[in-house]
Regions:
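Bacterial N-terminal signal peptides that target proteins for export
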Residues: 1-6
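Bacterial N-terminal signal peptides
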Residues: 7-14
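Electrostatic cytochrome c docking/interface patches
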Residues: 19-38
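Extracytoplasmic/secreted proteins, especially bacterial periplasmic and envelope-associated proteins
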Residues: 30-34, 57, 70, 74, ...
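C-type cytochrome heme c attachment motif
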Residues: 36-48, 61, 90-92, 106-110
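Gly/Gly-Pro-rich "capping" loops immediately C-terminal to redox-active cysteine motifs
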Residues: 44-80
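Axial heme c-ligation environment in periplasmic c-type cytochrome domains
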Residues: 56-65, 80-107
Length: 115
């Protein structure tokens, strides 16, 4: 009986605290903040995002991003410099022009993958 109680106690102690967000959840929130920041990503200026107010309609809607971009690097590269794949793209080359750092682009990718 003592052994069962001890195992249960250890199991309970190993559960994550409800007050602590997972590292991925934290990254998603940071990516969302960047994507809606007028001085940073500002994705809503051109793209529709489900649940967002006043979305743009110049670019494709940002949904099912994992299905559309199964390889993270492809989505990262699109955000970093969309003109590399399509020189006529109106999407700003966020990384190439120093609008976003590599880490900020990765945070936005984490957010996009959550959509």
């Amino acid at each position: 009986m003592k052994r069962i109680v001890m195992i249960a106690a250890v199991g309970i102690l190993m559960l994550p605290s409800p007050g602590n967000a997972s590292p991925l959840a934290d990254r998603v929130l940071k990516g969302k903040a960047i994507s809606s920041d007028n001085m940073k990503g500002n994705c809503l200026a051109c793209h529709a995002i489900q649940g967002a107010e006043m979305p743009g309609n110049l670019g494709p809607p940002l949904l099912q991003m994992k299905l559309r971009y199964p390889k993270r690097k492809v989505l990262h590269d699109q955000i970093w410099d969309a003109t590399k794949k399509n020189p006529q793209s109106i999407m700003p080359p966020f990384g190439k022009h120093g609008i976003l750092t590599d880490e900020e682009v990765n945070l936005v990718v984490d957010y996009m993958y959550s959509l």
